[in-house]
Structures are given as C-alpha cells and as structure tokens.
C-alpha cells in the first residue's frame, strides 16, 4: 500500500471492529493510511469489551488530545476516566456495581461521543421507515427465530470428571512453563513479566475452551501440554531455560484461532535467549513438576471416557430435526481439531454432504464454500449441504444460501454469536426465517427446566472458578451465568437490537418535507446547525 494511499482522499474501512487493538502492527499501518483523510468506519459491533475499543477507532480520524467533538477536546482523558471507574471495582466481588458502571460508561460514550459521529441503523428502523423502498426493490429481512438450546447430557461419571477437570485447570494448574520469568531471580524487564503472566492466563482459557468444545480436542491439548512440559523440565534439569519476548506478540493470533499446537511450536522453536537454570527460584521446578503431575492425573481421568454425549446428541439432532434435515447448515466451532473431528463423524452419517473449512484450508476450499453456500455466487454448485468451520468464516463471507447456524461451542461472547449469524442473516436471502442452535453442557434430567438449570450451573462453574480470568473467556464482556444463558437463547443476541431508536425517524420527517413541501424545506435549510 506504500504510495497508493496518497492517491485517495476517502478511506472506507469495513469490519472496523477488527482494529480495536491499537498495539498491533496492522493498526499502526492503517493509522498511517488514514492520516489526513476522510475516514468512514463500518461495523456492526463498535463497542465490545471496554470504552477504549471506541477510542482506538476514534484515533483513526480524530486527534486524541485535540478532537473536534463538541465539548470533548481531550478524548484520552475522557476514556481514561471511564476505564478508571471500572478498574476500581472487582467484577467478581462487586458484580452489580460493576455492571452499573459498565452501563453508565456505555451511556456516557453514547451521549457524549457517538451521537456526534455515528450513523446507526437497525433492521427494525429500516423496515419501519423505508418499508416501501424495500418492497419496490424486492428485498426483505428474514425473521429471526429464538435460538434453540441443545443440551448434551453427561452421565454421573462424565459429570464428575468434567467438573473435577474444570477445577484442576482453573484453580490448581500454575501454568509455570508459560511464564518462567516470573520465577527469575536476576534483572528483568517488567513488561516481559506481564507478557508472560498474560500468556499463562491465555493458556488457561485455551484449555477451558477446549474442554467445552469437545472431549476429543481437550484430550489432544492435554497431550500437547504434557509433551511440552516434559521437554521443558528435561532442559531445566540440564541447566537451561529458554524464553523469548518475540512470541508474545504473535501468540494472540494463534490463540484467536484456538490453534494451541501452533502456540506450542512457536514457544518451543523461538529459543532466542538462554537463561541459567540456577537463576530461577526453587519454586519454579516445584511448580513445573506439579503441573506435569496434574496433566498426568487429568490424562488418566479421561482415559476411559470413550462415550461422547455431545456428538451423540448432535448426530441425533441432525437426523431427526426437520429444519436441519432439509436446509443448508453452518456449524461453527472455535477449535480446528473439533472441526476436523466433527467433519469425520458427520461425514459417516451424511457421506459426501459435508465440507470443512478452517485456517489451514486452501484457497480452492474457500471457492467451494462460496459456490455452495453463497446465494449470490456466479458459479453456484450443490455438492455440499453441511459446512463445518471455525472463526475464519465468522466475518467477511456471505453464506446466506443457508438459514441455519449451529454453535457447537458456547459462544462465550454474545457479540461473536451475532457475527456468526450475520453470515446468513442478509437482506437478500430467499429464506423467510433464520434459525440458530447453541450447545450447552448439562446433566441427565427429565425436563427442559432441569436441563436448563444444570447448564446454567455448568456455565457458572466455568466463570466462578476462573475468577478475574473469566474476562478473557468472555472477551471482556461482563456477564454472569444466568445472563449469558438468557442472551444466548434470545433473538436480541442475534439481531443486535434492543437499544433506543436512532435519529432515523427525524431524517424520515425531513425527507417527507423535502418531497412534499419544498418551501418549508428551503426554510429548514437556512436554520443554523446548532
């Protein structure tokens, strides 16, 4: 792009929420491109985790210390104050107050910042004020059915092992192998220490997500964790500790795709610096060996777990549910290994109908996805009816030949659910209704209420045992177990609506005046803007 940006005055950034993190090299490059330009950001989810999400986007076209937003020249101070309000509270101990402050912050941002900068359009408003235009163009929005929860029921033995494992990986495991510098006795860089602490937290979340994703993916991850611990301890006993600052910046990309195999390789291969094992506290080896024994314990616990209640429930649902039997289906999972596992098992029951696409797929596979699942594809095919995919297809690709999304993992952040369903929830779809199914772990029960209650308890166990680290699981969104379950089983989580009307109704009034009373419209045009 060097030199190309100089030829343009206007920059339009689609899926702008992908640039909420200003510490990345991509953001830095985009910031250079936008400098001195007119910038338009297009996104369905501008605010996801914290108020600073918005600030990062604003910096692409506003000077943070000298903005032109009315009565708000210093954006850094404004957003810093909002962040400070949250940092004073412990989300776990002061949950209600934390939620109140979160809502208050969102209102402040909306009233003092976004109303001056954002043009917001919801489908409800467009149907209300531009229904005639839609009709004339032969367009319509599909109805969004209430998401259907699918409960996979753990038997007594499975439930015991599942619950015990959550406790072990969330509370007992130290993740010492991923943060060696926290045990170092020599001089160190504080930023490196913090980076490794974050690494430990993210590896914890990765294991938790794997456990909920599929028993298969979890077992594979435990094997890899155990292998990397064995190698690390062997090197430590030889007097060597290898670590590097380099991998910490890249690892988040792999974690985003839940590719822990790539994370392990990155950490193991990037042995840029060697430290003498003598310069680490005795607690380091103790914790390393403790974690290794814990991994062996977990592996033994799961050795006899051959039944997969989640997969069994899914295959039965695919075979008996009329909506799933007759429509194109998109199955989302955050784990590449779960995607492969699902593909192999679903293909046994529906041979030749299943296509898999993840981060390791080739460009030709992407073309297959488009030809079979994009309703507007110029080279439409009907070779596949079921698509198993990861987050790589949650944005940027239209899949609206399908009207069904199945979330095989819990979408811990409801924003992700909206993005996934957005692939099929298009204005030009030929389907009348959009369907969503979400999986939840539960225990054997004889009623929907009992299953729902048990599922909420499972979610609560994840969030409670993770404590402050739960914010990494939900990607910063503060939710409790009941609220999360309710949001994931409501249509609002899919269409993203539920807030107050925007200014569209007033613009519609002005438009009507322009069309029907030109004299009054000329008078309005002469009115001062403020």
Indicate residue ranges for each PLM-predicted region.
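Conserved SF2 helicase motif VI
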Residues: 414-431
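Conserved helicase ATPase core of P-loop NTP-dependent helicases/translocases
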Residues: 360-389
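Conserved helicase motor "Helicase C" RecA-like lobe of SF1/SF2 P-loop NTPases
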Residues: 334-356
